[in-house]
Amino acid sequence: MDNQKALEDIRDVFSIFHDGTIETWNGNQELLKLKIDCEYLAERIDKSYASFYVKFEKIESLEFNPWMNPINQPQILFTSIVDIFQATLEILSAEIENEFVKITCNQHNLYFNYCGGTLLVNCKNVKVFDEKNNELTIDELDKICNEYWNEVNDQIEKSIIEKERK
């Protein structure tokens, strides 16, 4: 997979998992597996599912730039996988910036001295799996996401129409 395609895939995966959380991890720079809790999408595959697994293959760069809290603390940079994923990170957005995907995250655990930050990643390949380890393509994941948001939009429109009739 060429580097630009890999960046686009990483961006697309993390954009789809908006509001999901990075809960756990295992692996290393060669193969890193993240557990992403995103129940509203996972349960569309199987009602009992709450998570997905994202595998990064051959990581070239991975770092986390936290938003210090309080803001006057010295800025730190996490480059160790252990440090990067020590707290649960809530996924807000993802975009390509230079040679990285910049994933903006919140972090709500007051035990840590930061309240979120930006996760920068670049790897050779990214793959997504459901809870039974069935691989999902980006297109399949995108379809699941679009169907969910179309249903939400339809429910909102229906609710507005019903309120207008009263």
What annotation goes with each model-predicted range?
Residues 1-166:
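Surface-exposed, interaction-prone regions used to assemble/regulate multi-protein complexes
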